């Protein structure tokens, strides 16, 4: 069995292509089932976000498995197989495990160290698990990856520092006010940066937010989308009298907020602090306003300095997390190697306990007068003898897990003890056959 990961992401395809290869949420369960029913696939998890579409799979053959996954993606989105090959990257074995660990911990994200991907990986795994397309390997590996990512984030605080301008804007406001939940905010503009700033304000706990824009329809649309207030740009002077935070991002060629405007409203603000954050180029807020008492004015250069410093902190944290990945891969490989040993040990124990049971039956027939106490003592001691006899063989079997010729030696081990253990590959194939029947039955039932 082999583990492969096929990824279409921000490095391999531009956003125009990524938009065309994203699964709708309501189509993912069927997609999991369709892929699982494909030849060569033994387990699979599909991850589909705005920045990546990835298929993780356990396959019986690498080349065949890759082809059928690429064909599955091509058919799902109306591409040729060669198109999918050109826009994706393929990871196999240890590289695939490393890829999953890096993705889950945010090291492979556009925004280094972001935590949203962890939840998305978890949701993808849970969906696959509930659909029935995961088995022994992925049930272990994905839990390991999720646990690793949680620990990495907790130990390094990689996600604590803002590395986007819109997020940094909110962080600056926090430096002035501390908690923002009770504050009033104004968003000037209705474009992409304004929406990102609005989302970050909502994420900080602020609910009293007003969107203002030169075109009132655009302000109305953005406000309705996020259930906040809106107003005309001409109302800005009045709104400023009670606002605590203003984030401005327009394409205006003249200042939206001037020194004169702030001086006029400052008299009515009773020395309350006002944070003005200008993320527009050219600037929306006239320079020099910060000279007025309790007015804090930041422009895009101030934000860039904060973002750059925070990015350096994240890069250091990312390096620390990366150093931990080889140990995780090693732990996974050790666990995988034990998969072939466990059935052998189980078969050996079962045979030994069967012999012990036969021996006790023979003793019962030959010594029918034994009391229950005497019988328990004999049973206990025969089991103890068996455990002592099995101790060294079991130890040797476990050591074979790391041997390069483990399969051959485990087969010899089974021949010596005259036992037969089912290999993990056969178990996986049987498990798949059973689950495919369940999926087919489920579909027939749904159709009826």
From Swiss-Prot:
The GO biological-process annotations, alphabetized, read as: protoporphyrinogen IX biosynthetic process
Q: Where is the active site?
A: 50 (nucleophile)
Give residue numbers for the site Important for activity. Answer: 99
The protein's superkingdom reads: Bacteria
Which residues hold substrate?
A: 49-52, 109, 114-116, 120
Q: What is the reaction catalyzed?
A: (S)-4-amino-5-oxopentanoate + tRNA(Glu) + NADP(+) = L-glutamyl-tRNA(Glu) + NADPH + H(+)
Task: List positions binding NADP(+).
Answer: 189-194
How is this protein named in the record?
Glutamyl-tRNA reductase
Q: Which InterPro entries match?
A: 4pyrrol_synth_GluRdtase, 4pyrrol_synth_GluRdtase_dimer, 4pyrrol_synth_GluRdtase_N, GluRdtase_CS, GluRdtase_dimer_dom_sf, GluRdtase_N_sf, NAD(P)-bd_dom_sf, Shikm_DH/Glu-tRNA_Rdtase
Task: Report which gene this protein is encoded by.
Answer: hemA
This chain's source organism reads: Staphylococcus aureus (strain bovine RF122 / ET3-1)
Protein's pathway: Porphyrin-containing compound metabolism; protoporphyrin-IX biosynthesis; 5-aminolevulinate from L-glutamyl-tRNA(Glu): step 1/2
Enzyme Commission number(s) of this protein: 1.2.1.70
Supply the HAMAP family for this chain. Glu_tRNA_reductase
